[in-house]
């Protein structure tokens, strides 16, 4: 199953939530696909489910119900690429947004450099203090690599990877003049430009690699948060050479599967061509090189923005660009789109060859209306087939770190606690199920099924603490089944210090391949 998040906006930029399955068409490599899964997601819809508690009026000895975090927002600052001025403006805008953090929200601060990280918390002072420690962490010192000739990563990619001799010769002419070399040294100047391009490319490629690696790690971290999951990628954008296309698609696939929305904020604001920006020094000497660099700067700026747009639109998120009102950008991006759709299709005759499949999504209406459609650009075919055991494991893991409640099996969740001292307590997670309403497979005169029961505890900030899995292999004769009690109770204990916790219970059976997932909360004073 390939999932395609789609945001459809009208001509005023408002997300639409009134479309039906019949309004959409999905094309895989130009071939129309049958949409077999159609979901309309509305902002806040999971919040209502997450607020549900099992024991509304706990008796003495049972668990109380604390406030449950509903939304997790990770501010990911691309300090590898953010110039100081843009970093300060976006940092301050994030700080003003964090000052309005709701009681049921948790925020985290991550950086592409891996420095100055704060995990999910509702401690606004701690978050604000960390923002003030943000710095530009580029691998190269500012101004250290942009020398004579001033070759950008985009130009270096053209020169080294794409063998663009025109750009190389222009860079050689620039080096000849800015280094004060005689005309007959042009060949040497071109070699110097080639060396500088390789140097710039090496540094830029390393920074791109680190950025993708960190973003993948943040998506993986977000997948374990029990609620709405939003990443705000704050970056001027960056160049991503072709070889990183699989990394981009892997990140989008993981984000889609984990219901993680990536919203992108172009921290450059309204982009200005450096060649006409009076606040920036003009480091070029020859007019021809300046014209070429100006053209490449514009193409580079567009390519940088494309990366941010692709991450946002490919995960059902939003992209804020060409706007200096970063406060408004932060306000818009810290929440998901009001509406978005998830379209699922099963590719026919899909080869497990790892090849790229370009996607196109269209929206049709009667009468015809112009829509702005934002959707992922494609996916990569798998390189191996998955088996039933792997699929079951993935389903359970996805359900465990979700807040969506499922009721396909007759299961109830109850929680109790036992406080041994001021520092030690035990949470009892009790799974109650009705065995007579579970599907069994008859074989060798016995009723067979395997139940997988997973209980998990999260702290008050939604951080995963512990999970325990139990497997119940049922092989019962009819006469034994007839004597079963109306309810089975299976208890799982967790040792914790007093505090507030969230509980998640997932139960899956092997025969019906049905699943129930329930939420609970515990407050131990």
Task: Describe every region a protein language model picked out.
Residues 1-525:
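Scaffold/interface architecture of coatomer-like assemblies
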């Amino acid at each position: 199953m390939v999932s395609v998040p789609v945001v459809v906006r009208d001509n005023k930029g408002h997300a639409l939530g009134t479309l039906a399955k019949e309004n959409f068409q999905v094309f895989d490599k130009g071939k129309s696909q049958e949409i077999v899964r159609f979901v309309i997601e509305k902002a806040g819809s999971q919040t209502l489910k997450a607020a549900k508690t099992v024991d509304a009026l706990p008796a003495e000895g049972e668990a109380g119900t604390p406030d449950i975090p509903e939304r997790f927002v990770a501010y990911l600052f691309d300090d590898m690429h953010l110039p100081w001025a843009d970093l300060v403006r976006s940092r301050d805008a994030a700080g003003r947004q964090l000052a309005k953090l709701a009681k049921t929200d948790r925020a985290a601060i991550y950086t592409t450099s891996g420095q100055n990280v704060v995990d999910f918390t509702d401690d606004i002072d701690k978050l604000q203090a960390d923002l003030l420690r943000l710095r530009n962490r580029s691998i190269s010192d500012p101004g250290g690599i942009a020398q004579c000739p001033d070759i950008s990563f985009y130009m270096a990619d053209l020169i080294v990877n794409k063998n663009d001799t025109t750009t190389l010769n222009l860079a050689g002419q620039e080096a000849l003049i800015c280094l004060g070399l005689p005309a007959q040294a042009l060949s040497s100047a071109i070699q110097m430009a080639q060396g500088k391009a390789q140097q710039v490319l090496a540094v830029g490629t390393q920074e791109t690699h680190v950025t993708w690696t960190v973003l993948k790690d943040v998506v993986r971290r977000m997948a374990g948060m029990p609620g709405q999951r939003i990443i705000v990628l704050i970056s001027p954008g960056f160049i991503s050479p072709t070889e990183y296309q699989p990394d981009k698609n892997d990140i989008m696939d993981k984000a889609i599967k984990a219901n993680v929305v990536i919203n992108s904020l172009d921290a450059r604001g309204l982009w200005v061509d450096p060649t006409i920006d009076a606040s920036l020094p003009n480091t070029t000497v020859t007019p021809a090189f300046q014209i070429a660099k100006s053209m490449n700067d514009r193409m580079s700026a567009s390519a940088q923005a494309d990366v941010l747009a692709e991450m946002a639109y490919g995960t059902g998120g939003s992209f804020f660009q060409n706007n200096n009102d970063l406060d408004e950008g932060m306000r818009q991006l810290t929440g998901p789109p009001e509406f978005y759709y998830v379209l699922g299709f099963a590719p026919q005759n899909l080869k497990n060859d790892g090849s790229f499949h370009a996607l196109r999504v269209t929206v049709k209406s009667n009468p015809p209306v112009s829509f702005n459609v934002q959707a992922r650009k494609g996916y990569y075919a798998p390189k191996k087939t998955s088996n039933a055991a792997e699929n079951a494991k993935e389903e359970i893991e996805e359900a465990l770190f979700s807040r969506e409640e499922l009721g396909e099996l007759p299961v109830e969740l109850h929680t109790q606690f036992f406080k041994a001292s001021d520092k030690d307590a035990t949470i009892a997670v009790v799974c109650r199920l009705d065995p007579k309403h579970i599907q069994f497979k008859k074989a060798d005169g016995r009723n067979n099924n395997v139940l997988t029961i997973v209980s998990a505890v999260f702290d008050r900030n939604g951080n995963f603490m512990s999970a325990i899995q139990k497997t119940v292999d049922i092989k019962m004769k009819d006469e034994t089944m007839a004597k079963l009690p109306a309810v089975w109770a299976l208890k799982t204990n967790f040792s914790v210090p007093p505090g507030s916790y969230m509980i998640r219970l997932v139960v899956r059976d092997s025969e019906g391949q049905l699943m129930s997932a329930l939420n609970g909360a515990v407050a131990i004073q």
